[in-house]
From Swiss-Prot:
E.C. designation(s): 3.5.1.108
Gene Ontology molecular-function annotations: metal ion binding; UDP-3-O-acyl-N-acetylglucosamine deacetylase activity
Keyword hit for Metal-binding: yes
InterPro entries registered for this protein in UniProt: Ribosomal_Su5_D2-typ_SF, UDP-acyl_GlcNac_deAcase, UDP-acyl_GlcNac_deAcase_C, UDP-acyl_N-AcGlcN_deAcase_N
Reaction catalysed by this enzyme: a UDP-3-O-[(3R)-3-hydroxyacyl]-N-acetyl-alpha-D-glucosamine + H2O = a UDP-3-O-[(3R)-3-hydroxyacyl]-alpha-D-glucosamine + acetate
NCBIfam families: lpxC
Protein name according to UniProt: UDP-3-O-acyl-N-acetylglucosamine deacetylase
Entry binding sites for Zn(2+): 76, 235, 239
Name of the gene encoding the protein in the UniProt record: lpxC
Keywords: Hydrolase, Lipid A biosynthesis, Lipid biosynthesis, Lipid metabolism, Metal-binding, Zinc
Species: Halorhodospira halophila (strain DSM 244 / SL1)
A Pfam family the protein falls into: LpxC
């Protein structure tokens, strides 16, 4: 059978929260089969399982909330776990926010690969899309469609000089594209004016040119420029992959986003789960039964 995965060993890192600016200790630990991804607040001795229903705030990031306990900015770490096929993991945090690291999923990919990956004696579960599902909010929309693989496309639309030279749309079919090489390094981005307003409201206190692409009225301020020509839209794809992993399983289907964000992504997940005829949970006995997007080596 195609088995679930967890980490071989625990691994620790230190960073700062993007919005709080607080120092955060992060430890990724192996978890038993069928546990899922569980965030544990070591400062409060409380835990929250990563599920679509646990999302309680999506204004600036994806935030899990349960009985007043919060864990925010989970999407980059979840994207890395999804990209590496990790089904079960304890995420221990000393504060309320996952550290922003360099603003991408790449540091989390490095941590997981350094800890090692092991298979477990339980079948890996997939969610297969059977019927189209869509959520529309004005000129923004998100949709799932049936697809025998995993494909994510996204369109952004910003009225700003920097984006005139940018690819506004990207599509990633993971049967032929490496998450690690082509998506994981895309950093979060923000506009200087918005960052100044956020800081005035005591938010984005940990943000800097070391962990985000910052854009002023005319240009990218980071001296090293962009990691990909289409890094802005690639980061939206990275975010979406993390948000979609709140299904608790790898997805067999395609996702399309147009000018959407964390809120619409979560609304789409909830709508999908409400429509039981639109999806099914599946497992696979043999590797050659898997959609090609999932039979690639982890190190690709």
């Amino acid at each position: 059978m195609i088995r679930q995965r967890t980490l071989k060993n625990s691994i620790r890192a230190t960073g700062v929260g993007l919005h709080t600016g607080e120092k955060v200790y992060l430890t990724l630990r192996p978890a038993p089969a069928n546990a899922g991804i569980i965030f544990r607040r070591t400062d409060l001795d409380r835990e929250i399982k990563a599920t679509a229903a646990a999302v309680g705030d999506t204004r600036l990031s994806t935030c899990l909330v349960e009985d007043g306990v919060r864990v925010s900015t989970v999407e980059h770490l979840l994207s890395a776990l999804a990209g590496l096929g990790i089904d079960n993991c304890y995420v221990d945090l000393s504060a309320a926010e996952v550290p922003i690291m360099d603003g991408s999923a790449a540091p989390f990919v490095f941590l997981v690969r350094s800890a090692g990956i092991k298979e477990q004696e339980a079948p890996k579960r997939f969610v297969r899309i059977l019927e189209p599902v869509q959520v529309v909010d004005g000129d923004k929309w998100v949709a799932f469609e049936p697809f025998e693989g995993f494909k994510v496309s996204f369109t952004i639309d910003f009225d700003h000089p920097v984006f005139l030279d940018q690819h506004a749309r990207a599509e990633v079919d993971f049967s032929s594209t490496s998450f690690i090489k082509e998506v994981s390094r895309a950093r979060t981005f923000g506009f200087m004016k918005e960052i100044e307003a956020l800081r005035a409201s005591r938010l984005a206190l940990g943000g800097s040119l070391d962990n985000a692409i910052v854009v002023d009225d005319y240009r990218v301020l980071n001296e090293d420029g962009l990691r990909y020509r289409d890094e802005f839209v690639k980061h939206k794809i990275l975010d979406a992959i993390g948000d979609l992993y709140l299904l608790g399983s790898s997805l067999i289907g395609s996702f399309h986003g147009h000018k959407s964000g964390h809120a619409l992504n979560n609304r789409l997940l909830r709508k999908l789960l409400e429509h039981e005829h639109a999806w099914e949970e599946v497992t696979f006995e043999e590797l050659d039964e898997l959609p090609i997007a999932y039979d690639q080596p982890v190190v690709a």
